[in-house]
Amino acid sequence: MEFAENRYSRAHEILFDGGLRVMGSSSPLNVPPPMSVPAYMDPEEALVASVSSCHMLVFLYLASKAGLVVDAYRDQAAGYMEENEAGKMAFTRIVLRPAIAFSGPRLPTATEFDVLHKKAHENCYIANSLKAEIRIEPERISGLRSEGHGRPEYMS
């Protein structure tokens, strides 16, 4: 009877290639707990994370090809939903705010840094698949280091 009354759990498991299991749920902003689980990934978060991850991976590839060393990459991405022209809720804007630290004998110029992000955006097939405006607001910083792992840290 709970299902017919729309009081069922939205918790579910998402299985990825390679065996990764991620717990998913509707957003608690859309469906209140206990029918949703706030600690689980919701589709809105997954979409923004996919755009962020795609941009990061293309950026790292391009930086590596250019002979640059990226020590850390962290993105504080955000998605914005509004009513679209058809009166339906949709992502209208996704903003990526990557903070990137470089080291090594060659550091990118400001122009090269901007071009890397432009090319990363142009070659991100996830971003190319969406109608939402995608804005990149990168920051080149120093002092961003990994959390003591002894290896670079990439987080989107």
Language-model features and meaning:
Residues 1-49, 57-156:
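Extended beta-strand/beta-hairpin segments
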